[in-house]
């Protein structure tokens, strides 16, 4: 395949044929066939360690979800939720050895589904902070060390494969092809995205101001 690749422009192929050879050669190279035996051994070790770390990361995420529930002691804080929802939270607390309390279990998503319904701002803040802190609380399920290891292993693997960094390795087979092209595209999109975000922010602020005024409470940004 390497011989065909090196002579692809002299084989009388059409554009599709040349592209096919280039594709096969790229797959050949990214599979590590151009590496020395020592490099192949190291790549194998990296892949094995990455698989282990990825599995551990996922297990930690699930454990954090199960151990990051927000506990509420005053039913009044749950204003905005239906009686049925509150009953579910009470049962969850009871099932976890906390009768008389309310347990808001987190879900494995960025946004927690109960946030839009809860009127109490302080409770919304507690839920949000508990959600974003998952995996970085310094406990046995903290994923920061794993992320650091995976980042270093990705960089090492990319270097062995002949790429300047993991981003270049990952993008080589994508439409953008390289980090520079991605950064150029993002820089072109950024002004419009920022302007739109500010516009949406103004709409949300007006909504907050209106709702707080209706409640007779001070607004917030």
Residue spans for each PLM region:
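Short His/Asp/Glu-rich catalytic/ion-coordination signatures at enzyme active sites or charged loops
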Residues: 3-45, 105-145, 149, 153-196, ...
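Active-site-proximal, well-structured secondary-structure segments within enzyme catalytic domains
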Residues: 16, 20-22, 49-52, 59, ...
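Elongated amphipathic alpha-helical scaffolds of membrane-associated proteins involved in membrane
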Residues: 28, 35, 39-43, 50, ...
């Amino acid at each position: 395949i390497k011989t065909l690749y090196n002579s692809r422009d002299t084989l009388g192929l059409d554009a599709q044929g040349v592209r096919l050879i280039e594709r096969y050669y790229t797959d050949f190279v990214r599979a590590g066939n151009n590496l020395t035996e020592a490099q192949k051994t190291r790549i194998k070790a990296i892949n094995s360690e990455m698989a282990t770390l990825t599995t551990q990361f996922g297990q930690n995420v699930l454990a954090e979800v199960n151990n990051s529930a927000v506990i509420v002691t005053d039913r009044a804080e749950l204003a905005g939720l239906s009686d049925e929802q509150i009953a579910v939270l009470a049962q969850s607390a009871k099932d976890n050895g906390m009768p008389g309390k309310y347990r808001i279990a987190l879900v494995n998503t960025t946004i927690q589904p109960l946030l839009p319904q809860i009127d109490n701002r302080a409770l919304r803040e507690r839920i949000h902070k508990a959600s974003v802190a998952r995996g970085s609380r310094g406990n046995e399920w903290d994923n920061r060390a794993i992320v650091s290891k995976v980042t270093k292993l990705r960089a090492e693997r990319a270097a062995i494969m002949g790429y300047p960094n993991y981003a270049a390795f990952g993008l080589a087979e994508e439409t953008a092809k390289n980090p520079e092209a991605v950064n150029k595209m993002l820089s072109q999109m950024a002004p419009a995205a920022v302007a739109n975000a500010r516009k949406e922010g103004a709409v949300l602020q007006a909504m907050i101001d209106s709702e707080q005024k209706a409640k007779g409470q001070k607004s917030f940004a």
